[in-house]
Amino acid sequence: MAFMVKTMVGGQLKNLTGSLGGGEDKGDGDKSAAEAQGMSREEYEEYQKQLVEEKMERDAQFTQRKAERATLRSHFRDKYRLPKNETDESQIQMAGGDVELPRELAKMIEEDTEEEEERASVLGQLASLPGLDLGSLKDKAHSTLGDLKQSAEKCHIM
């Protein structure tokens, strides 16, 4: 009970008195960081090693994501003929140079490319004209072809 009162009120009381008490809590300063966390020295070292490894993995994943984004930006710069950015190139090189885009991003780029190819075609240009009914044009073309085939068959029989 005394421990709980000391932990709850002790810090506030020290702040109030301005730590005039001198060295009454110096015994806690002698503990190592491992003992303060309730671990043995070996456990603490293993814990620190795991923390370092996890940090390295997170940094590697972060670098990979940055490189993927840089690859996407450079793709769009090439696509729209914008000037290249050296920071993007350096991010790609930091990740190992060969960066694959995630499936979703690659799918988006592929869809954009297909749409642009469709717009670049003659039918895509015709479809973009206002007041032009592409469906009726196709129907007329098919009926004309059908009429031509029938007239060609009649001539061939004679």
Curated annotation (Swiss-Prot):
Primary site of residence: other
Keyword Mitochondrion: no
Keyword terms, alphabetized: Cell membrane, Coiled coil, Exocytosis, Lipoprotein, Membrane, Methylation, Neurotransmitter transport, Prenylation, Sensory transduction, Synapse, Transport, Vision
GO BP terms in the entry: insulin secretion; modulation of chemical synaptic transmission; regulation of neurotransmitter secretion; regulation of synaptic vesicle fusion to presynaptic active zone membrane; synaptic vesicle exocytosis; visual perception
Lipid-anchored residues (S-farnesyl cysteine): 155
Membrane topology qualifier: Lipid-anchor
Biased composition (Basic and acidic residues): 23-33, 74-87
One GO cellular component term noted in the UniProt record for this chain: terminal bouton
UniProt PTM: Farnesylation mediates presynaptic targeting.
Region (Disordered): 13-47, 74-99
Highest taxon above the source species: Eukaryota
Statement: the UniProt record of this protein carries the keyword Transport: yes
Molecular function GO terms recorded: neurotransmitter transmembrane transporter activity; SNARE binding; syntaxin binding
Localization annotation: Synapse; Cell membrane
Propeptide: 156-158
Coiled coil: 39-74
Matches recorded under Pfam families: Synaphin
Positions bearing Cysteine methyl ester: 155
Purpose of the protein: Complexin that regulates SNARE protein complex-mediated synaptic vesicle fusion. Required for the maintenance of synaptic ultrastructure in the adult retina. Positively regulates synaptic transmission through synaptic vesicle availability and exocytosis of neurotransmitters at photoreceptor ribbon synapses in the retina. Suppresses tonic photoreceptor activity and baseline 'noise' by suppression of Ca(2+) vesicle tonic release and the facilitation of evoked synchronous and asynchronous Ca(2+) vesicle release.
Family statement drawn from the similarity comment of this UniProt entry: Belongs to the complexin/synaphin family.
PANTHER family xref list: COMPLEXIN (PTHR16705), COMPLEXIN-3 (PTHR16705:SF5)
Identification of the protein by name: Complexin-3
